[in-house]
């Protein structure tokens, strides 16, 4: 598995398996199969409500000798409602995952909300049916909590998720331990070149969630526009004898982002790893750069009642 060295000094595999919205009854089998075919990076979150199930799969993998803990890279994320309780939330995730440390801990959204209980990950709405944001906690305070998880030995690397450029800049300014990773939506239809280049310039690894666009997974949630249907990408895929999804992932890796695709199907899991076995030409990379639509598919405003990217 190809890796990249983070600013923290640790190695992170450039392809991870995203575990969002995987069904609980299939999660264990998916993780074990993924490990068997070569996956070493798993992307979790408290909000996915599956950390305990992931923990059971990891425990079995370790017990049976399928893989050693030090061979895996485990990421999880703190939810909005726990910004004021970072260390406690981290320990809660570790307990569920049945591991002693996290390889990477991310702030899921730059948006503290009303706390209810550690690890419960509620998104409480106010009387106006709008997400109840906690204005008493600053993102700097949240980051200080993240830094404490490192000093306590709970976490090796810390980072951001769904942060825009200027919030990333602010974190770089006030942090004592710099964010090693910034995970955000990016794919051929939403390339975010300025954010990608800014992160790379300042030693933050850009990591693509939703690297295929979201329509293939859930059209009701993400809309029907998908780069997988794009004629340019389909032509490139035919040229290389690959799937459009493989072209999207390979493009992401060649622009020096890590990618976190999601799948539960063993054949697609294998195909996703195969993107490490070929390269796109410079001409085809530029061709894909030309199809950017600035089309964001991940829109929490649909359930939270406000545009969190405003």
Curated annotation (Swiss-Prot):
Function: Synthesizes sorbitol-6-phosphate, a key intermediate in the synthesis of sorbitol which is a major photosynthetic product in many members of the Rosaceae family.
Record: residues binding substrate: 108
Record keywords: NADP, Oxidoreductase
The protein, known as: NADP-dependent D-sorbitol-6-phosphate dehydrogenase
Oxidoreductase found in the keyword field: yes
EC number(s) per entry: 1.1.1.200
GO molecular function annotations of the record: aldo-keto reductase (NADPH) activity; aldose-6-phosphate reductase (NADPH) activity
Cross-referenced PROSITE patterns: ALDOKETO_REDUCTASE_1, ALDOKETO_REDUCTASE_2, ALDOKETO_REDUCTASE_3
Active site: 48 (proton donor)
Protein family: Belongs to the aldo/keto reductase family.
Domain of life per record: Eukaryota
Site residues, Lowers pKa of active site Tyr: 77
Any Pfam family: Aldo_ket_red
Residues that, per the record, bind NADP(+): 210-272
Lineage: Eukaryota, Viridiplantae, Streptophyta, Embryophyta, Tracheophyta
Top-level class of the enzyme under EC nomenclature: oxidoreductase
InterPro entries: AKR, AKR2A1, Aldo/ket_reductase_CS, NADP_OxRdtase_dom, NADP_OxRdtase_dom_sf
Swiss-Prot/TrEMBL catalytic activity: D-sorbitol 6-phosphate + NADP(+) = aldehydo-D-glucose 6-phosphate + NADPH + H(+)
UniProt KW Oxidoreductase keyword: yes
